[in-house]
Amino acid sequence: MARRSSRHAAAHADDSVFEPFFIPGRGPAATKHGGLAAEPERERSYLAKIRPQSDGQRALMAALERHSLTVALGPAGSGKTYLAIAAAVEALTSGRVGRIVLTRPAVEAGENLGFLPGEMEDKLAPYLRPLYDALNERIGGKRVKQLMTEGAIEIAPIAFMRGRTLNNAFIVIDEAQNCTYGQIKMLLTRLGWHSTMVVTGDPDQTDLLEGMSGLRDIARRLEPLTEIAVIRLSDRDIVRHPLVAGMLTVL
């Protein structure tokens, strides 16, 4: 599956100018969806400034560039979801893919989902909010709504992925530690032609009953395959408030 030549080589020599996720106005998607060329200068310059803050993040960014399937394991705040979504946005706006598909399990909803007010979209919104937040921070809420209306961005719970084949897409599976082995296997087989998939999660923070999460086992089985990247981030890669890393070591 390794297919793209790395554009990082020269940039790695100087992290202060490391800008791998911005190619303004290139490719058909940039025209079809308005591209970044139509965005205000403030937003375009902000998009250009995504940079790795650690060796682990640097390895993840390189893997996202080179592999069709990447599994990113790491604690909260290590940047795995944000970097995956940043790569997805770049792939869409540069024309490498035609759409972004973001999915995560709605574990907390469970059987109580039916008691929540509103239509299904309203019921699921709180559980998909972290994905909206990452997109909004990346390209702005107005742009996110526009791309979702056009069908260029889809955010859905994992249950909605069954039976689909996702071609020409960048797929991010977030919070995969809350998926069973069977669910992750099902999701991996959704990968279609000309697509990239990223699976992110922290095996140490699952909300499932002990032994039910399949993320750790899936990562172990996939790691020997050279066509697939398995990146393991650690507390050293956390870029949230310094207290987060400290708390994770004792809680």
List each language-model region with its residue ranges.
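Loop/turn-to-beta-strand initiation segments
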Residues: 96-98, 150-153, 167-170, 184, ...
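Pre-Walker A adenine-sensing motif
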Residues: 50-67
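Conserved P-loop NTPase nucleotide-binding/switch module
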Residues: 106, 110-117, 170, 179, ...
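Conserved P-loop
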Residues: 71-78, 82-152, 209-224
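Interdomain "pre-motor" coupling segment immediately N-terminal to P-loop NTPase/helicase cores
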Residues: 1-39
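Conserved helicase/translocase P-loop NTPase motor core
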Residues: 147-164
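Conserved coupling/interface region of RecA-like P-loop/ASCE motor cores
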Residues: 218-251
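Catalytic acidic motif of RecA-like/P-loop NTPases
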Residues: 77, 159, 177-178, 204
